[in-house]
């Protein structure tokens, strides 16, 4: 979806991320399979800061509802940042490979990836395997210091399906199914690569396992599409409640550095022990 966000809408977040690449200390570093740092910070609460308004914009929520075929709720969002020269990668995975183990019964879930910076091959854009969501959920497990999809099935998928890179301009967006195989590479450029992921679940598909309070249903206060340009937000992220510590590697990733954000949720993102 080219130009899903205008330059005027995306620039405040882009500028803030460039000015403070640790997001005030909120950003945590998770290990990839080779032990390299990959920086990310999730949040489930939606504030009146810019990062809390983005997942609630009418056009963002309406598209999610159309694709899901029913009412969605905000499961979580996250900022994923690759600084210039960072070696960290996201290994091949499906989001539902993890969310299934959090007690979500059906794969009626999706994510919209919103480019804050230009996303290129050189700075670590996302790669996907086209139509791989039709393969269903593939088992995930430990891969070095991280976790990822079963390698034998990944190899077969890559033999039969096309791998493509998502080259995005700032403000472009892509919605993708929770079973779509995706990954991203290192940033070998001198430019940062920041992307916002907003994930939604169907309201009749809540996780049933205990310990998932962070992903409980909360009514979504949708805001008009002009909320950002009209300045109907407080700060970019200063008041946002982030999850700055993933607990004990809840998604199967080793935590190299926990965030130190003052407004931080307890670590309640973990998956069941089967992963």
Ranges and model annotations:
Residues 83, 129-136, 199-205:
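Short edge-strand/loop segments of extracellular domains
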Residues 1-103, 141, 211, 221, ...:
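Non-heme Fe(II)-dependent double-stranded beta-helix
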Residues 23, 27-28, 33, 180-275:
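Non-heme Fe(II)/2-oxoglutarate
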Residues 70-77, 88-90, 108-114, 124, ...:
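Generic beta-strand structural signal
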